UniProtKB/Swiss-Prot annotation:
Alphabetic keyword roster: Ribonucleoprotein, Ribosomal protein, RNA-binding, rRNA-binding
Lineage, highest ranks first: Bacteria, Bacillati, Cyanobacteriota, Cyanophyceae, Synechococcales
PROSITE patterns: RIBOSOMAL_L31
Subunit structure: Part of the 50S ribosomal subunit.
Name of the protein in question: Large ribosomal subunit protein bL31
Disulfide bond annotation, renumbered to this chain: none
Record keyword Nucleotide-binding present: no
Record-linked PANTHER family: 50S RIBOSOMAL PROTEIN L31, CHLOROPLASTIC, LARGE RIBOSOMAL SUBUNIT PROTEIN BL31C
Molecular function as annotated in GO: rRNA binding; structural constituent of ribosome
HAMAP family reported in the protein's UniProt record: Ribosomal_bL31_1 (MF_00501)
NCBIfam families: L31, PRK00528.1
Function: Binds the 23S rRNA.
Length: 74
């Protein structure tokens, strides 16, 4: 016989909320799940890629410290 009060409350219709809008329902141990990103607005799933950093880290380092990036001639 299973013990009473051992398992958490199960919510079969828990709301997933993104930007104040209910985007889907899932089963969870919490009645509401607040998320910043979900498959409906993530660039990988929507196909709309955004370029966040157009300059690479190495180029930024080279520019910051005044290095040309080439090897010195002997």
């Amino acid at each position: 016989m299973p013990k009473k009060g051992l398992h958490p409350q199960w919510y079969p219709e828990a709301k997933v909320i993104c930007n104040g809008e209910v985007v889907m329902t899932v089963g969870s141990t919490k009645p509401e799940l607040k998320v910043d990103v979900w498959s409906g607005n993530h660039p990988f799933f929507t196909g709309s890629q955004k370029i966040i950093d157009s300059e690479g880290r190495v180029e930024k380092f080279m520019r910051k410290y005044g290095m040309s990036g080439g090897k010195k001639a002997k």
